[in-house]
Amino acid sequence: MEVANATQQKHFVLVHGAGHGAWCWYKLKSLLESSRHKVTAIDLATSGVNPKRLDEVDTLQDYCLPLLELMAAIPQDDKVIVVGHSYGGFCIALAMDLYPKKISIGVFIGSIMPDSTHPPIYFFNQYYEWNPDGDDSPDTKVETYGCPDQPRTVIHFGPIYLSTKLYQNCTSEEIELAKVLVRPVTLFSEDLSKLKAFSEEGYGSVKRGYIICSEDKAFPVGLQHWLVDNVGVSEVKEIKGADHMPMISKPQELCQCLVEIAEKVV
């Protein structure tokens, strides 16, 4: 891949999806860095090697705190490209809303992408309308914890779900890696139901890009196209043959998409 010169160098901030962590970007991070770009891959709360437990994180903002702390530390004159995968779309939207002047574009990969008109729960519900089975699988376990009057839901992705819905185009070794590293998740649906729409002057002022995964069995391809058509983006790419985890199954193609998008933003 062509090496970026000093004026072309970009800073990519990679934000994983539910249950995953910074580890899932290992191929893409190496490719972008070999092109002389700066890359920061973070672990959100309760994810990867982050020490937080599920019972210590109550809200979307709590979950996104590592990302928000990173954004707060970025110098005012710097701009980054935030990249969100799957549920991570909510996280980069929050960062775009709070730090619009520090972000040149937000890129959504097979991801929820809100607008500045509807509350976040609207897009959470759209996912289940397009995908009524949701995360159901013979080996996916759903449990509740916390106070009986305000129970929390936690989802454990099983190996069958991982191998058939998320990683179906990945190698057996990559699937085994996911089985070892993926952590239980909560989706903060109760908190999402209380949140207002992201602001037009914040989130709505930042450019958006979308990368469609053409063989995604976890986040419906039809919903990805619907989001592009109804929310609106300045850049759209599609990766043929990509499952829900293109950073692992199609890293070269994903890298090329991100570099091409980056070249078009200041």
Curated annotation (Swiss-Prot):
Annotated catalytic residues: 86, 216, 244
One Gene Ontology BP term is: jasmonic acid metabolic process
Q: Return the Pfam families for the record.
A: Abhydrolase_6
Q: Answer whether the UniProt record assigns the keyword Metal-binding to this protein.
A: no
Q: What is its EC number?
A: 3.1.1.123
- Reactions that this protein is recorded to catalyse: 17-dehydropreakuammicine + H2O = norfluorocurarine + methanol + CO2
Keyword annotations from UniProtKB, A to Z: Alkaloid metabolism, Hydrolase, Serine esterase
The pathway noted for it is: Alkaloid biosynthesis
Question: GO MF terms on file?
Answer: hydrolase activity; methyl indole-3-acetate esterase activity; methyl jasmonate esterase activity; methyl salicylate esterase activity
Task: Please list the residue ranges annotated as the AB hydrolase-1 domain.
Answer: 11-121
Keyword Hydrolase present in the record's keywords: the answer is yes
Membrane spanning stretches? none
Q: What does the entry state regarding organ or tissue expression? A: Mainly expressed in roots.
Family statement: Belongs to the AB hydrolase superfamily.
Q: What does this protein do?
A: Hydrolase involved in the biosynthesis of curare monoterpene indole alkaloids (MIAs), natural products such as strychnine, a neurotoxic compound used as a pesticide to control rodents, and its pharmacologically active derivatives, including brucine, used to regulate blood pressure. Curare alkaloids act as animal glycine receptor antagonists. Catalyzes the conversion of dehydropreakuammicine to norfluorocurarine.
What is the protein's quaternary organization? Homodimer.
| Protein name as catalogued | Norfluorocurarine synthase 2
Can you name the source organism? Strychnos nux-vomica (Poison nut)
Query: Gene encoding this chain?
Result: NS2
